[in-house]
């Protein structure tokens, strides 16, 4: 049970089993069942060891940390840096972001703006319809993604489309491009290459190369622009 509470700003609270205040450095350390709660901006951040640096308005967590944001997103990471005034979360550790639409993001070295609902990350893997049928996978070397409307820009892109998108479950349709952009309805890959040849099979190798390839997620089509 949380038996201590500290108010670090109006409508913002830190709950923990114990606190240690280093007065001469203006630092507050919270230990055990730590929870940051902001009732106005609707987020909760939990973990086991948080250090609040009052002068810099910064909180650094140690170990596994979870953030529940605006009743829409759950972030699981470790060793997070939380810039309070900017409402920004960041970590160089591996991170998982889940939304309410069965979409999951795995990333490293991420930065997330709570207010803008935008995150930047490296080695990003997005899985749509997570643990459900007709799941697609998007790989980005690095990307900037708006979680609110799914708009994104990315470098070094690879998409693995669910097998039966073209009514053939034997296919392994996939697209690669040096960069990409898109939203919840489509993805455009630049200098793209497409193949549906099954991986690790004796399928005759073939591919379509194009200046741009547009993957329409709604119509389930691919359009090429040479």
Regions found by a protein language model. Give the residues of each.
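Structural signature for solvent-exposed beta-strand/loop edge elements and short helix-capping sites
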Residues: 1-226
């Amino acid at each position: 049970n949380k038996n201590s509470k500290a108010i670090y700003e109006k409508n913002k609270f830190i709950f923990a089993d114990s606190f240690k205040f280093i007065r001469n450095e203006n630092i507050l350390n919270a230990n055990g069942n730590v929870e940051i709660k902001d009732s106005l901006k609707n987020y909760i951040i939990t973990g086991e060891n948080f250090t609040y640096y009052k002068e810099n308005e910064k909180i650094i967590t140690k170990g596994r940390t979870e953030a529940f944001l605006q009743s829409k997103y759950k972030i699981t990471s470790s060793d997070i840096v939380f810039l309070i005034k900017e409402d920004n979360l960041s970590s160089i550790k591996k991170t998982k972001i889940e939304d309410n639409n069965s979409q999951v993001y795995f990333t490293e070295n991420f930065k997330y703006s709570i207010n803008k609902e935008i995150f930047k990350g490296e080695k990003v893997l997005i899985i749509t319809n997570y643990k459900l049928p007709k799941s697609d996978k998007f790989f980005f070397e690095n990307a900037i993604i708006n979680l609110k409307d799914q708009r994104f820009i990315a470098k070094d892109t690879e998409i693995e489309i669910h097998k039966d998108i073209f009514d053939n479950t034997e296919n392994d349709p996939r697209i690669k491009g040096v960069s990409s952009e898109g939203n919840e309805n489509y993805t455009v890959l630049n200098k793209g290459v497409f193949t549906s040849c099954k991986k690790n099979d004796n399928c005759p190798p073939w591919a379509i190369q194009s200046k741009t390839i547009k993957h329409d997620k709604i119509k389930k089509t691919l359009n090429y622009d040479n």
